[in-house]
Amino acid sequence: MIGRLRGVLLEKQPPEVLIEVSGIGYEVQLPMSSFYALPDAGQEAIIYTHFVVREDAQLLYGFADKHERAMFRELIKVNGVGPKLALAILSGMSANQFVQCIHNDAVTTLVKLPGVGKKTAERLVVEMKDRLKNWTGADLLTPASDKMVFENEFTNSAASGNAKDEAISALVSLGYKPVLAEKAIQQVYVEGMDCEALIRSSLKSML
């Protein structure tokens, strides 16, 4: 089981990164919250991972801390929720926000997430309510040194047409339809916004 990677980021293309550890490049898919907590390509990063082995592939999913990874693991226990949908959910809201939705039976909010229909939202509430009853939001002992490496210290650059395209591509990869993704980006775009801000604002506007 690969549970943690520390190395140099070679590439960043939302929602995936390529990180080199001891000469080996690992492709890792992350929720947007974790993706944009990473530094720029060429810098060192630490990623907590969940390793999935399938008949046709071996996949790594990455997270900023153990808390977010723990929520991902709870999500994929739900019938009908796979890793891709779990990433989309954690991209649309934080783990703590999701817990509040479950506790409040907020089906109308959950169905606004990509790939989550009414039946899936209801199933999430039914299957997870008891399991998340004592969810504290604790960081599950993520070492402080790891957090420091994971913190994003880069300066945001001004948004361009490429930033818009990248943001739309990221939303589509999360499960949003291209037309809806483009519309959401156009609605929130303000001159000077970078790709990260575009994605964050568009996701928030669709909830």
Swiss-Prot record:
Region (Flexible linker): 144-158
Chain intervals for the UniProt region annotation (Domain III): 159-207
GO molecular function annotation: ATP binding; four-way junction DNA binding; four-way junction helicase activity
Domain of life of the native organism: Bacteria
GO cellular component, one term: Holliday junction resolvase complex
Keyword Cell membrane in record: no
Chief localisation class: cytoplasm
Keywords assigned: Cytoplasm, DNA damage, DNA recombination, DNA repair, DNA-binding
Ranges for region Domain II: 65-143
GO terms of biological process kind: DNA recombination; DNA repair
Compartments reported by the entry: Cytoplasm
NCBIfam families: ruvA (TIGR00084)
Function: The RuvA-RuvB-RuvC complex processes Holliday junction (HJ) DNA during genetic recombination and DNA repair, while the RuvA-RuvB complex plays an important role in the rescue of blocked DNA replication forks via replication fork reversal (RFR). RuvA specifically binds to HJ cruciform DNA, conferring on it an open structure. The RuvB hexamer acts as an ATP-dependent pump, pulling dsDNA into and through the RuvAB complex. HJ branch migration allows RuvC to scan DNA until it finds its consensus sequence, where it cleaves and resolves the cruciform DNA.
UniProt free text on domains: Has three domains with a flexible linker between the domains II and III and assumes an 'L' shape. Domain III is highly mobile and contacts RuvB.
Family: Belongs to the RuvA family.
HAMAP family xrefs: DNA_HJ_migration_RuvA (MF_00031)
Protein known as: Holliday junction branch migration complex subunit RuvA
